[in-house]
Amino acid sequence: MKLRDRPQVRLDLLFTLCRLHREGIAARITRDLVPTRPELLEIVRWEQRATREAGPLLDAHGWLGPDLVGEVGAEAAWWVILLCDKHRLFQQNAHRLLQEAVDQGAAPARHLAYLTDRLLMHDGEPQLYGTQYILNADGSIVRHPVAVPGLLGLRRHRVGLPRSDEARPADLHLMPLTRGPLGAASVSFIG
């Protein structure tokens, strides 16, 4: 594809998504591994802002993919949506839009894998792709249960994720630090 054949990126949307991403990271920088109550409240306030701003963008444009907001904007949109855990309807609507985008080849399947696992985890169901981890109050990290663990490698391969046995503790990025099932905090493996 030649440069002139590429669709024009909506810079206004890109800037909004990158700002929300930056603010979300800032809200998640905590003094300790397990956030304090004031830190959790800041995360909740960020989630409210993010859904208030990103929700209308999804309604107006559908999935915020690379053709609309560039690769950086698409990653930022996915990250923001993934972490708005207290806004299930928002995440479920985004999941539907992301599924359509993946089916059309307009978004990476790995994004759908993470969001699918996130929704399953918060429903108390086993995840499919092994992307979600639980951060316990004592600071220990455990993988949220996986449905049919013997098929995990195949499912991960199909969506472009590395084998789960290749994960090392250093590969765990504590990006989502929000609630898991029963109020536990959760983290995601970034593969």
Positions of predicted regions on the chain:
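An N-terminal structural lobe/cap that precedes and organizes the functional/catalytic core
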Residues: M1, V142, V146-P149, L154, ...
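N-terminal helix-rich structural modules
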Residues: M1-G124
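A short, structure-level motif marking secondary-structure boundaries and short turns
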Residues: L40, N136-G139, P181-L182
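A surface-exposed partner-binding patch
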Residues: G65-A74, R158, P162-A170
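Short, charged low-complexity intrinsically disordered segments located at boundaries
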Residues: L83-F90, Q127-T131, G183-V187
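An amphipathic alpha-helical core segment
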Residues: L98-R158, P162, D171
